[in-house]
């Protein structure tokens, strides 16, 4: 890779690198706690399972509307979720839909599962991991209800 002329002065480069190291170390330290690491992995795994399940439904829904796309290209819009679930005959209550697919709760800026996943992917600080620990069971319960609803529909549709 060709070496471009730096846009920062040497002391600014050093300060920027030091800031990056500090933030990387904060993430490492936050995830060094075994319980925080377990919560993180449990949540990320279940959210990923829910997301691929939902995006599979969304992909078919979009194709039925004449919009060809792939799962990788899909964006989740919370206001679209009830329509997609109805299309696939998946029964999930409004609170679970909000808990899984909204980014934040109203003006509180408290993370819902999708927002939590985003912040965990970009900067899982101790503060965020503490919020996850407090809300993990709510997230996991809502996600499990979606997973079960999709599984139940798959079984009833084939019987």
Task: Give the location of each predicted region.
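Charge-enriched, short contiguous segments at helix-coil
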Residues: 95-159
């Amino acid at each position: 890779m060709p070496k471009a002329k730096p846009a920062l002065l040497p002391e600014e480069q050093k300060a920027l690198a030091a800031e990056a190291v500090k933030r990387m170390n904060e993430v490492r330290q936050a995830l060094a706690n075994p319980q925080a690491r377990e919560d993180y992995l449990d949540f990320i795994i279940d959210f990923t399972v829910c997301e691929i399940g939902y995006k599979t439904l969304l992909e078919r829904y979009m194709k039925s509307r004449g919009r060809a796309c792939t799962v990788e290209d899909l964006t989740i819009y919370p206001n679209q979720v009830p329509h997609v679930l109805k299309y696939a005959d998946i029964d999930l209550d409004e609170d679970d839909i909000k808990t899984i697919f909204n980014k934040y709760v109203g003006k509180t800026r408290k993370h819902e599962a999708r927002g939590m996943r985003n912040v965990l992917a970009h900067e899982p600080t101790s503060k965020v991991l503490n919020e996850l620990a407090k809300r993990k069971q709510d997230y996991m319960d809502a996600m499990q209800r979606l997973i079960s609803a999709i599984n139940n529909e798959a079984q009833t549709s084939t019987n």
